[in-house]
Swiss-Prot record:
Gene3D superfamilies: Aconitase, domain 3 (3.30.499.10). This is 3-isopropylmalate dehydratase large subunit. It is an enzyme of class 4 (lyase). It comes from the Bacteria. CDD domains: IPMI. Its EC number is 4.2.1.33. Pathway: Amino-acid biosynthesis; L-leucine biosynthesis; L-leucine from 3-methyl-2-oxobutanoate: step 2/4. It holds the Pfam family Aconitase. InterPro entries: 3-IsopropMal_deHydase_lsu, Acnase/IPM_dHydase_lsu_aba_1/3, Acoase/IPM_deHydtase_lsu_aba, Aconitase_4Fe-4S_BS, Aconitase_4Fe-4S_dom, IPM_dehydratase_rel_enz, IPMI_cat.
Length: 484
C-alpha cells in the first residue's frame, strides 16, 4: 500500500494499534525516540513521577535545556524574576534527581530547545520527537514526526516513552518555482498560513514539497516547519535528502562510520510514495511570492509588504470581519495604510524560527555599511551559545554592534513575555518570531512577523521595509534567497 512520509514514520513507531476504524478508532500507542525538555512545561511532569514513585523510563532519550525564562544579558548574575528563577532551579534539581542531561545557562550547548536539538545531531530523519512546546514541529524539517505536547503528555512520555495518539490526516503543501532575491522561507510559511488560515491545518500533518522547498537549506526548512502549528497543524515535515545529510554529517550525536551509511540507506526510503494520496493538497507559486508581513494579531493576518492594511470589509466571513476589526484596534492601524509606511519602535532578530547562522548572516549582509534609524531599538539574540560563538568567529557581532544593535546571549528572549526582554505598552515591533498574538511580546505590545532581511531593512529605514527599498550600501552584499 502506498504511503505518505508521515504515514511511514507513524507506522514504524506503533507499539500497539488502537481498536476500531474510522471515527470509532481508538488511539495508537507510539514509541517516542527523542524527548526535549525545558523549564516551563516540565516541573509538574517531574513532580507527577515523584508522587507516583515512578522512574524516568529513558533518561538517555531525554534532553533538557534552559531557554524560555532565561535572561539574555548578565547571565552570570542571579536571575532577578522570582518565578523565572524558581522554574530554572526546579529544572536543574529535577534533571539531577532523574539523571537527565541538562544544558544550563553558561553551558557551551545551551540555547533554544529547537535550535539545540538539530545542531547537536539529536534530531534525525524518521524519528518521533516530542517536547512540551508548540514549535516542536521545527524538527520535522529532517523528516521526523515532531509534535508539541501538553504537560500531562510530557509526564506520560517520561514514564513510558510512549504517547497515545489518533492518526492525523495528511496535507501536501506544494511550493514550485524559484524565490526572488529578498524572499525567503519565512515569506513562504507566512503566505501558506495566510492562504489556508490559522485553522486550515487542524487535524493534519503538513508535508512541504516541490522545487522551492528542495532548494532551501536545512535552516530555512526548519523555519517553515517551525510555524506549521500556526496553521493549526500538529506537525510539518520535509522529506530528507542530500541537503539533510550534508547538514547532519559529523554532528556530535549523528551516526558515524558504517552506522552512518546504514542510516542514510534507511533515510532514503523516507519519502512519500509516488502513488500515495494526500487528504488535501495546497499549491503555492514561489515565482510570484513577495516579502510577507503580518498586520494583525494572528499569523494568518498577513499580506505582501508591498500592499496595504486590509479593511474589515474585505472579509466576507462575519467572524473574520470581526477579528479584523479587533486586530486593527489593538494594533493601532487604519485600513488602507501602506504597509511600508508603518513605523516601528523595536526590531527583534531571534526566536526558534529565525535565530540560526543563516538568519544572522542574512541580516548582517543587509545592515553592513548602513546606518540604523536612530529611533529604532534592535535586539539580536542568537538561538544557542554555539550559534553565538560561531557568529562571533565570523565577526557578525561586530557588524551588529557597529550598526547599533544589542548583541545578546542565547534564549527565547522577546519571542514571548516570560523573561526581561519585553515590549512596553503601545510599542511596535518587527519580529522574526512566530506569534503576533495580543501581548505576546509584552502587555500591550504590537507585533509584526517578518523575515530576517525584512527585519534588517526595517531597522535601517524605521518603517516596515524590504531590502529592495534600501539605497545601495557602501559595502553591498547579495541577499540569498535560501536564507530563512
Amino acid at each position: 500500500m502506498a504511503k505518505t512520509l508521515a504515514e511511514k514514520v507513524w507506522d514504524a513507531h506503533v507499539v500497539r494499534k488502537g481498536d476500531g476504524e474510522g471515527a470509532n478508532a481508538q488511539p495508537d500507542l507510539l514509541y517516542i525516540d527523542l524527548h526535549l525538555v525545558h523549564e516551563v512545561t516540565s516541573p509538574q511532569a517531574f513532580e507527577g513521577l515523584r508522587l507516583a514513585g515512578r522512574p524516568l523510563r529513558r533518561p538517555d532519550l531525554t534532553i533538557a535545556t534552559e531557554d524560555h525564562n532565561t535572561p539574555t544579558l548578565d547571565i552570570d548574575k542571579p536571575i532577578a524574576d522570582l518565578t523565572s528563577r524558581t522554574q530554572i532551579q526546579t529544572l536543574r534539581n529535577n534533571c539531577k534527581e532523574f539523571g537527565v542531561r541538562l544544558h544550563s545557562l553558561g553551558d557551551a550547548e545551551q540555547g533554544i530547545v529547537h535550535v539545540v536539538g538539530p545542531q547537536l545531531g539529536l534530531t534525525q530523519p524518521g524519528m518521533t520527537v516530542v517536547c512540551g512546546d508548540s514549535h516542536t514541529s521545527t524538527h520535522g524539517a529532517f523528516g521526523a514526526l515532531a509534535m508539541g505536547i501538553g504537560t500531562s503528555e510530557v509526564e506520560h512520555v517520561m514514564a513510558t516513552q510512549t504517547l497515545s495518539l489518533k492518526p492525523f490526516k495528511t496535507m501536501a503543501i506544494n511550493v514550485e518555482g524559484t524565490l526572488r532575491p529578498g524572499v525567503s522561507a519565512k515569506d513562504i510559511i507566512l503566505a501558506v498560513i495566510a492562504k489556508i488560515g490559522t485553522g486550515g491545518g487542524q487535524g493534519y500533518v503538513l508535508e512541504y514539497r516541490g522545487s522551492a522547498i528542495r532548494a532551501l537549506s536545512m535552516e530555512a526548512r526548519m523555519t517553515i516547519c517551525n510555524m506549521s502549528i500556526e496553521a493549526g497543524a500538529r506537525a510539518g515535515l520535509v522529506a530528507p535528502d542530500q541537503t539533510t545529510y550534508d547538514y547532519m554529517y559529523g554532528r556530535p550525536h549523528a551516526p558515524q562510520g558504517a552506522e552512518w551509511d546504514a542510516a542514510v540507506e534507511y533515510w532514503n526510503t523516507l519519502r512519500t510514495d509516488d502513488d500515495a494520496t494526500f487528504d488535501v493538497e495546497v499549491d503555492l507559486d514561489a515565482d510570484t511570492l513577495e516579502p510577507f508581513v503580518t498586520w494583525g494579531t494572528n499569523p494568518g493576518q498577513g499580506v505582501s509588504l508591498s500592499s496595504r492594511v486590509p479593511s474589515p470589509e474585505d472579509f466576507g466571513d462575519e467572524n473574520a470581519k470581526a477579528a479584523a476589526e479587533r486586530a486593527l484596534q489593538y494594533m493601532g492601524l487604519e485600513a488602507g495604510t501602506p504597509m511600508k509606511e508603518i513605523r516601528v519602535d523595536t526590531v527583534f532578530l531571534g526566536s526558534c524560527t529565525n535565530s540560526r547562522m543563516e538568519d544572522l548572516r542574512a541580516a548582517a549582509d543587509i545592515i553592513r555599511g548602513r546606518t540604523k534609524d536612530p529611533n529604532i531599538r534592535m535586539l539580536v539574540v542568537p538561538g544557542s551559545a554555539r550559534v553565538r560563538l560561531e557568529a562571533e568567529a565570523e565577526g557578525l557581532d561586530k557588524v551588529f554592534k557597529d550598526f547599533g544593535a544589542e548583541w545578546r546571549f542565547a534564549g527565547c528572549s522577546m519571542c514571548l513575555g516570560m523573561n526581561p526582554d519585553q515590549l512596553e505598552v503601545g510599542e511596535r515591533c518587527a519580529s522574526t518570531s512566530n506569534r503576533n498574538f495580543e501581548g505576546r511580546q509584552g502587555k500591550g505590545g504590537r507585533t509584526h512577523l517578518v523575515s530576517p532581511v525584512v527585519a534588517a531593512a526595517t531597522a535601517v529605514r524605521g518603517t516596515l521595509s524590504s531590502p529592495s527599498d534600501l539605497d545601495p550600501a557602501p559595502e553591498s552584499a547579495a541577499v540569498s534567497s535560501s536564507a530563512a
